[in-house]
Each structure stands twice: as C-alpha cells, then as structure tokens.
Amino acid sequence: MLISNEWLKEYVTIDDSVSNLAERITRTGIEVDDLIDYTKDIKNLVVGFVKSKDKHPDADKLNVCQVDIGEDEPVQIVCGAPNVDAGQYVIVAKVGGRLPGGIKIKRAKLRGERSEGMICSLQEIGISSNYIPKSFESGIYVFSESQVPGTDALQALYLDDQVMEFDLTPNRADALSMIGTAYEVAALYNTKMTKPDTTSNELELSANDELTVTIENEDKVPYYSARVVHDVTIEPSPIWMQARLIKAGIRPINNVVDISNYVLLEYGQPLHMFDQDAIGSQQIVVRQANEGEKMTTLDDTERELLTSDIVITNGQTPIALAGVMGGDFSEVKEQTSNIVIEGAIFDPVSIRHTSRRLNLRSESSSRFEKGIATEFVDEAVDRACYLLQTYANGKVLKDRVSSGELGAFITPIDITADKINRTIGFDLSQNDIVTIFNQLGFDTEINDDVITVLVPSRRKDITIKEDLIEEVARIYGYDDIPSTLPVFDKVTSGQLTDRQYKTRMVKEVLEGAGLDQAITYSLVSKEDATAFSMQQRQTIDLLMPMSEAHASLRQSLLPHLIEAASYNVARKNKDVKLFEIGNVFFANGEGELPDQVEYLSGILTGDYVVNQWQGKKETVDFYLAKGVVDRVSEKLNLEFSYRRADIDGLHPGRTAEILLENKVVGFIGELHPTLAADNDLKRTYVFELNFDALMSVSVGYINYQPIPRFPGMSRDIALEVDQNIPAADLLSTIHAHGGNILKDTLVFDVYQGEHLEKGKKSIAIRLNYLDTEETLTDERVSKVQAEIEAALIEQGAVIR
C-alpha cells in the first residue's frame, strides 16, 4: 500500500517529518518498506504557458515555442512533442534545472534554433508510464486547469510529496486504506482523525423507483446496496485526484472511474459503477453462476464460469463478476449519463477462488479476500455520491436500494487493567489504558475493573484479549516499556505431556532398533493420495498445485517413504531402515474441515545386520519387521494381535493387519514384488500404525513381578497343516488350551518342499512353560501338551 503524506494530511494533522512518521509506524508493527520522494533529483521545475508555437524551419517534427515561465520575457524552447500547442499550461524545466536520471538542463541549439529549457512529459519527471493517463502517454503533460506561470510545477501537480510504501502482513487489512492508516497515525500521535465529507444534496426522486436488488444466497453475499446518480458529465478528474491516484499506483481514466478508485483507496471499500442505461433492466439480482455460463469482462475476455463464482445480473444476464471485474456492456463510457454505484460484502473465500482460477488479481479482489469493514460499506457509497456530485455534476437520487444485512459494526471484548499489566510487565492505570483505546478509535465501557472495548469492524485482526494487549503495548511504545522479569502466579517445573513422553519413547525404541527418522512432504500426487490408505476416503486436492507430484494431501506416509528408500538404493545405500511420525489427512463433507491424524510408519530393505567379522549378515524379513513393531507395543505397554489381510500394494501372502483391543490400528507386510521392482527395491517390508489410536488407549500402571524362582520347561512341536492356515490360528488354539502354565510360544521354522504333500507346510513351534509357585513336573507339562496336541489335531493339523 502506497500512502501519500499530502493525502494523509487531509485526515490527520501532525507536526513531524515523514521520515520520523515512517520510523514510528515501523516501530509499532507496520513495516514501511520504502519512502518515495517525488522532489528528489528535481530542481527548477516550473509551470509554463505556451504563448505561441511555430514549426521549426529545419525539422518537420520540431516546434519552436515561446513560453511564459513567470519571468520578464518569455523563453524560447524547442519541443518535439506531438501534442504541444499554444494556449497550454505545461511543465517546464528551466536552464540550470535537474531531472531524475541526472539530466541537467542547459542552453542549447537544436537544428540552428536556440532552446532555453525543456517542456516535460510526466515520464521525464519520474512518473512511471504504467500510471500516466493514456492521453499523455506519448507527449508532454498539459494542465487541464489554469495555472500561474513560474510557480512550482511539483506543487501544481501535487507531487511535492513523499509517499510511504507499506509492507503489510495479512492481518492488517485496515491499513489498505487512507482512513485506516489515518486512524493508526492519529493513535500514534494522540490526535484526532477527521473523516471526509459524505453528504450530498439529494433529489426528491428515489432510487427505489428505478431499481430493485435481490440476493439469492446470503451466505455468499451477506449484503448488497446500490445508489443512483443521474446526469453525470464524463471528463478528466481534477489534478489533485489524478495525482493521488498516480502516487497510489493507479492510472487515471476519467472522473467517474477515478472516483471509484479514489474511494477504494480512501475507505478500503471496493465499489463498482454501472452505466444504468446499459444494464438493460430495473433489477439487480446477485446469485451464483450457472455451470458453464459465460460472460465477457472489462478486459474483453470471455470467461466460462463455475457455480462457485458469484455474479451480478440484470435478472438474466451477468453484468459483473462479483468482487473481481465488471462486464463489458455495462461499463462506464464517454456517453454514460446515469450511474448505479454498487457497495457490497462478498464471501472472501469465493472471491479468492474466482480471482485465482481466472488469474484476475486486482485492488478490489485483494480487499474482498481479506474481508470488508461493514462500517464503511454504505459510507463509501455515500462518499462516491458526494464526489460525483462535486466533480461530475451528478444529481444524486435519495434513498439506498439494498438487500441483506450489514452485520455488526463492533465486536465487544472484555478485559481488565490487571490482565494487561501482568502480560506486558508494566503498570498502566485504567484511565491510561482507556485513553489508548480511544486514541485507536475504539469506544469503551467501564464496569468496575472490567473494560469492555468495542472493536470496530475495520480491525478484523482484533478478536481476543491478547490482541487488545498487543494494541496497548504498540501504541504505548515497545521501546518505552521497561524491562522486567516475568511474574507468575504459580511456578511449576517444566515437564513433557504424556503424549510427548510416549512419542519420545517410541522414537528411542525405533532408533535403538536401527531405524533412522525421516520427514517427508505432506503433499503427494493424486495417484498416490489413497495408496495404502486405511480409510479410503475422499482426497483433499489443491486448487493450484505447484506440480503434479504435489497435488493432494496424503492419506498414508508410505508413498514418500518408499520413494526415499528407492532414492537411497539408487545411490548405493542398499540397506535402508526408515521411520516417520507425521500427519495424514482425510476429507469430510463440503464446507467441513478435514480430519488430521498422526501416523507412525516404517520401511526396511536390504540387510538388517551387515556381514561383520564377528558374525554373519541378517537380511530383513517379515519377522524382523514384526519384531520392530512389537518393540513399540511393548514400550507403550500395549498388546498387539495380528490377522492375515490382503492390502493393495502388499504381498498377498505376507501381510497382516495389526489389531489393538480388537480394532484395526495398522498393518505390516512385504511390499508387492511388482511395486518393489518398479522402485528398484529388493524384498522390502513396511508397517503403518494409527499413532493417534495408540496414544488414546489408557494403559494404566505397569505392574512389576519378581523374577521366577522356579525353572521353566520347553517343548517343541512340528505341525503339518494346509499352507493357507496362518500360524496365528495355530497359536491361538495352543494358548486356548495351555492353561496358566503356558507362558509364551515362538514359531521358529516354516518348511515347504520335499517330503510334504503339495499344498502343505510344516510349522515348528516352541512352547515355554512356567509356574511361578512351584517346580513343574514332566507329567504335568506332558498332560497340558497332550491337550494342546489333541486340539490341534481336531483343527486339522498332523503332529510330525
């Protein structure tokens, strides 16, 4: 935002330099990125009056002009501008003068004719061609009003000024207007802010007799109003208004369009002006666009609309794309006589989506996207009516045609002086605090020690007590607050939360098992968005992704972990063991926030233990990966169970779901050979757990038991079973009949091949028995073992 000091003085008067003002504003939270001085590098620039113009005798494109510059005699200046003519008031750089770019003006002879100065264009005095009125793009600037020759040209152009360039954070949308900035400056200097005149002399004719307004969806358009002005005269706007627009980075067009832009900058409220006679009806209907509906915007581009777009229509045809750009056939033209002025509040999200999709970013859309101050909507329209009456000879119809509700102008927030003082560490009286709020333009109500601050709608960044505390500290002055030690009502020792503690334990376990922690992108390709997803819900896609590889939010951590493993293997790091704790995302219904769930995932490939002098290497397999998962469950004092499963992307015979309290909380398995080959990986094992689900289980206290004083006993059993029977089913049967002396079991061998029928496999299981109260006898163990074997035989197993 570019803030002209000359313009700012219209609302607030301060006795300070612009550089000091910029420094003070920066110290209170709004960064002044640059200070533009239009008088810099300019010297001896005056207003001149062209008394006569004659063709140069030796150059067709040059003219010899006699110019009155306020001295005893006119000076002769040779000028090549095509639009120079007698009777014009122009900008003249006198001999001895200086222009931007180090240009010095000297007496010269041009093709034999003396020239004592230079008639200047706006570009030559430092104005960007982007902001110069089109009528002066290729020639000198000509004043539209009479001037006094010899007076300071910069003053006549309202360019003897310095402009502050604000680098605003998104929360300070109030400073995107001159009035919002004036409130800030008035607060800093404890002075009054004067608002501009908005009162018009209205006709007896009512706008309600000529126009109706209807809103079809007030969720998208809470409020829409219109006023009507008749008999406007289209002509250039006054010099002072053009200068203010140029200094704000906007090109002047004509008085009607310029007034619309002027009020936008003044109030931060975007307006749109329609040619009333071109609308084609006496009704304005604001609705969402029909799918595939088309309209041509002011830039002569035909746009295809979506139902998410908001359009202003004449009851049938769109005449404007709400908050973004007007339509071509209702625009203000040179012949326009009657004007309809729009002031509205549109849904910020809808405007943002439309402007980004169509790549139509403008001063108006950026303000609608940040939210509009309800207190200024009608006031800005009234200001435009006043300016049209004053500078376009307009006749303002009485009454406002509107639909919807503006909403609250203020938001009350209660706070106490004690709360403020405890936070900033400095004692201010209640009266001092109220004074600061009043300086900001906030009304207050006091009830004992409670201050109710009535925050105006222009300050959308203030919603909670802490925001008010920040305002007090800002306006009082951060540099003026003394350094103090913080005061605490209650001092407690710092400690980790239960979740933080458990998370650290899990990381330590996994790192101790040889895994390295990875952190990967939350964004994946649309194809990978649902890969390995445990919920298979609708994906969350970006509207404008930077690349196809980062187009959707992930539903699993594994796609990027597989990519990381492949990346490492391709660079000769063939033994990869990674884990990640991160968020995945699942969409809910339209308009609802998605679910964000924390997952724990891992990937292992290559050798787990490399071949060393003291032992042989150990290659990663299913049981090793399962052992890593079991370490996690043991550390968290949880008991996992496993159930065979078929999961896309994993080996159909080497995959299991992980259950906790009979609920699926994850899975483990070998990466499908095809997928592994696509990523140049050998046998690779992965696991994924719903970490939130693990954290939500209450495990109570860990009970410690003494080391057994009596010896245990082990028995091995080999079972021939159908190859499709999971070992887990056999273990379940064993534990069901093992009584209280069977402590644990271990599958230590699985065999398929010679000496076995086709479709059969042999599973060897070790059974460990223990009685903590007495020594086990062989007879007692044999009895339990026999019961187990009988149950297994009944299940279809053959004891080998």
From Swiss-Prot:
Keywords: Aminoacyl-tRNA synthetase, ATP-binding, Cytoplasm, Ligase, Magnesium, Metal-binding, Nucleotide-binding, Protein biosynthesis, RNA-binding, tRNA-binding. Its EC number is 6.1.1.20. Gene3D superfamilies: 3.30.56.10, Bira Bifunctional Protein, Domain 2, Ferrodoxin-fold anticodon-binding domain, Nucleic acid-binding proteins, Phenylalanyl-trna Synthetase, Chain B, domain 3. Transmembrane segments: none annotated. Its cofactor is Mg(2+). Coiled coil: none annotated. Residues 408-483 form the B5 domain. The keyword rRNA processing does not apply. It is found in: Cytoplasm. One of its GO terms (cellular component) is phenylalanine-tRNA ligase complex. HAMAP family: Phe_tRNA_synth_beta1. Belongs to the phenylalanyl-tRNA synthetase beta subunit family. Type 1 subfamily. Tetramer of two alpha and two beta subunits. This is Phenylalanine--tRNA ligase beta subunit. The gene is pheT.
